[in-house]
């Protein structure tokens, strides 16, 4: 029982492992890594408006966007979260919205994820029909929702913005 003015720290870890993997968790080390991660993000793309609430929301959105990248069997994948869509890519969430931001941030993991995302979608680009809506199950399956050109437009728009902000001419030529 805590007495007035006392505090306690409770550490929680959400983890997933394959049966043959081992996991050693050092909460002090994890806390130090997280603080370093956030410090680095705080030094990039700082939004300053007259409204401190908007500034703080932009900071939190940047952190959340950068911490939502997972190593999968198909490479790095950004997930929109919510607990339902891990190891899946969407033309709106990843291709159009978050990936172009990574070109501005200089966040290497985000840049690698973006390149992987666009490459994974490349094999689903057709001349006669729309690009798929989502790549799911670590890249093993797809979901082709709307089946209209909206997903194709989101992919193309996001890719163009990412390539312009990332600034790699050779990658753009590919």
Question: Which sequence ranges carry the predicted segments?
Answer:
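Substrate-binding groove/exosite segments of carbohydrate-active enzymes
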Residues: 39-173
